[in-house]
Regions:
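Mid/C-terminal beta-alpha module of Rossmann-like enzyme folds, strongest
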Residues: 112-113, 155-183
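N-terminal Rossmann-like NAD(P)+-binding domain of SDR-like oxidoreductases, especially those catalyzing
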Residues: 1-99, 143, 153, 172, ...
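Residues at or immediately flanking beta-strands
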Residues: 37, 90-93, 127-129, 160-162
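Glycine-rich "substrate-gating" loop/helix at the edge of Rossmann-like oxidoreductase active sites
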Residues: 66-69, 96-108, 132-143, 165-167
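A glycine/serine/threonine-rich, flexible loop-to-helix segment
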Residues: 53, 106-114
Length: 183
């Protein structure tokens, strides 16, 4: 379950999927195939509103989650570190910032905007409703993030790594109507 807002509606389900699911997999690896390399998709949401002095978030930045989703990801991240150290398992955690692809659901902002613009163009909708337009996000492409995941799993040593573009972008739309032929 990867939607922050929805995690407030279904916190127990979010924990079961994101934390207990990981714990179940780690137990199987520990008991039956300890040579397995495991990758955990952690989330920058684990940082909450904590930043280093230079306004960056890195592997050593304090983590202070502010949603059930972020708590579930921090729990999974922590149990991965515990299993890596206690059982000497090869477990890598990628602390991922936002990453997008055409496969991402329409309840996430980038595809929501595309879907809304198309619906307006086709006369199926008159407006597009969005949440906080002042939000700033570090957005990368899913293909680049998958490459980083592969590099982690092929590294000699397992560890935790932040995966980001190190650039933030506004959610504000810059004349989206022009792109679809609307004024």
């Amino acid at each position: 379950q990867s939607h922050v807002r929805i995690s407030f509606d279904i916190p127990q389900y979010t924990m079961n999927v994101n934390l207990n699911g990981v714990l179940n997999l780690l137990e199987i690896i520990r008991k039956f195939c300890p040579k397995t390399k495991f990758y955990q998709a952690s989330s920058s949401e684990m940082f909450g509103n904590c930043f280093d002095e230079d306004k960056c978030q890195r592997e050593t930045t304090k983590m202070s989650p502010v949603s059930p989703y972020a708590c579930s990801k921090l729990g999974a991240h922590t149990i991965c570190a515990n299993y890596r150290n206690a059982y000497n398992l090869f477990i890598c955690c990628g602390i991922l910032f936002n990453h997008e692809s055409p496969r991402r659901g329409t309840n996430f902002v980038t595809n929501k905007v595309v879907k809304g613009a198309v619906e307006i163009k086709l006369g199926l909708a008159k407006e597009l409703r969005l949440g906080n337009l002042n939000s700033m996000r570090d957005w990368g492409h899913a293909k680049d993030y998958v490459k980083a995941m592969c590099l982690m799993l092929n590294h000699d040593k397992c560890d935790d790594w932040v995966v980001s573009t190190m650039k933030t972008h506004s959610v504000k739309l810059q004349k989206p109507g022009k792109k679809i032929g609307k004024k």
